[in-house]
Design a protein with these regions (language model features):
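Glycine-centered recognition micro-motifs in short, flexible terminal segments and loops
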Residues: 2-26
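Alpha-helical hydrophobic helix detector
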Residues: 22-36, 50
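Short glycine- and Lys/Arg-enriched binding-loop motifs that mark or flank ligand-binding interfaces
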Residues: 11, 29, 348
Length: 475
């Protein structure tokens, strides 16, 4: 009889859907519960990963990179993580594991965590929580403490007009109508001669330029250095006074010092290594090198003298670099670690042509009285860089002194054509002069600006490039 009842039940199709649903209900509830709890756990993991990212980045911000105590760095990262990781649906706020690795100026932070997401269906899954974990790594190099040695060319060639209009006006107002010294007439350079009367003049070309409000290249260099040390209106951080250097020091939370020099036949000290603000006081003292008169640099010149002959000269770039090299100490990493010292950086601003009395002239042939006019001999640059010192070069391009309506030069300069033009071809941007200066600079730290260009902007951009550092999230 039981057997018959079972057979009737098997053949009966009434209520089959309800029975099948009842049989499937248990696994469906299990799957729905597991899916809901798993989805909530993944959401918690994403939020905790974001907290770990924020904590890792916070620990490599510029302000933290100056902190040498790992416990302070870890506490900062932990506080940021805790503020963002206090989420509902966790059994407790997780305590992160924070690993700090410093290598020189580089710091790597790893923030990892393990948390328990509370399950809504603990009986279905057979456990109260679902474990989630994750980590974030951030790496940054702190902006190093740096000493900057600003080396500005003040030789007579830096007295050229700043723009083509200035050059044209200089040539115009040094004509015989305005300049009685024949050797200084029709000249695009505002040479500063202390004994212009020797040549029959009453005022030198520099005095004429000042009287006519003609801007010179050295004026633009002075303005650029002033922006670097004294006044910059574009600092993105409020409350910072001073120039670009002070602004970048504040942004990078680091220390910069500056020394200010000019050079011609030798090195001229305007400010030894000090704060940028103190060095900035001396910017107004940047001025053109004076000469006694044409073809006589110093009083007492003589054709028989080996050091003060009767010829024009006045630019010893390699000599200035050698003198700076003797002043600069061995560079450090620039960290705040005990015993470490700042990095050392030379900023060279020049038109790139040496004009000096020398026993050797490796890049050119001698003119009269052992006068060597040549592109920079980079031997000293190599010596400095081999010490681990960086060199940044701003090339104020040597204008091609060839008659041209474009440049405003009315007459081709025969001296230029004889001694300089071959190094200034095919253009001032690509000739041997430019190539030598680029070879002198450390990789990536070279810039050039043509006559009439923005020297202030070029020097500012070059400095920011040297001083910049970044932090990045690795994973």
């Amino acid at each position: 009889m039981l057997r018959r009842a079972m057979l009737r039940f098997a053949r009966d199709r009434k209520a089959n859907v309800a029975i099948i649903f009842a049989l499937m209900l248990v696994p469906i509830v299990f799957l729905l519960g597991m899916t809901l709890d798993y989805t909530l756990a993944l959401r918690k993991q994403e939020q905790l990963n974001a907290a770990a990212d924020a904590a890792a980045i916070a620990a490599v911000r510029p302000a933290m990179l100056t902190q040498s105590d790992d416990s302070v760095v870890q506490a900062t990262a932990a506080a940021v993580f805790a503020a963002k990781a206090n989420l509902p649906g966790l059994s407790s706020t997780p305590t992160p594991t924070i690993n700090v690795v410093d290598s020189g100026l580089a710091r790597t932070i790893t923030v990892s965590y393990v948390a328990q997401s509370v399950n809504n269906f603990p009986s279905v899954l057979g456990r109260q929580t679902w474990q989630v974990s994750g980590s974030a790594t951030a790496r940054a190099s702190s902006a190093p403490n740096m000493n900057f040695y600003l080396l500005m060319d003040d030789s007579p060639s830096m007295g050229i007009g700043a723009t083509t209009t200035d050059i044209s006006n200089l040539i115009k107002y040094t004509a015989s109508k305005y300049q009685s010294a024949a050797s200084s007439q029709n000249c695009g350079f505002a040479c500063h001669e202390t004994n212009i009367a020797h040549d029959g003049g009453t005022q030198d070309n520099l005095a004429i330029a000042r009287a006519r409000n003609i801007t010179l290249r050295i004026d633009l260099v002075t303005s650029a250095v002033n922006q670097l040390l004294n006044s910059w209106s574009n600092c993105p951080q409020s409350g910072v006074s001073g120039g670009v250097m002070q602004c970048m020091a504040a942004l990078n939370n680091t220390t910069y010092r500056a020394a200010l020099y000019t050079f011609d036949v030798g090195l001229n000290t305007l400010a030894t290594l000090t704060t940028p603000t103190t060095a900035g006081i001396q910017v107004s003292n940047i001025s053109l090198m004076p000469v006694y008169y044409q073809n006589c640099v110093f009083s007492g010149c003589s054709s028989s003298s080996t050091t003060n002959p009767t010829t024009d000269f006045g630019t010893d770039i390699a000599g200035a670099l050698s003198s700076i090299n003797n002043i600069m100490p061995a560079p450090g990493l620039g960290s705040n670690a005990s015993g470490d010292t700042p990095q050392e950086v030379v900023f060279l601003v020049t038109d790139g042509v040496e004009d000096k009395i020398s026993a050797t002239c490796p890049n050119a042939s001698f003119a009269s009285h052992s006068r060597c006019q040549q592109p920079l001999d980079t031997t000293m640059c190599t010596t400095i860089k081999n010490r681990g010192i960086k060199i940044a070069v701003l090339y104020t391009e040597y204008l091609q002194l060839i008659a041209s309506a474009t440049t405003g030069i009315q007459t081709t300069d025969s001296w230029y054509m004889s001694w300089i033009d071959t190094y200034d071809e095919p253009t001032s941007s690509t000739g041997t002069i430019a190539q030598k200066l680029q070879a002198c600079a450390s990789p990536g730290f070279y810039a050039s600006v043509q006559t009439g260009g923005d020297i202030s902007g070029a020097l500012t951009n070059l400095f920011i490039k040297v001083a910049s550092s970044t932090a990045s999230l690795v994973q």
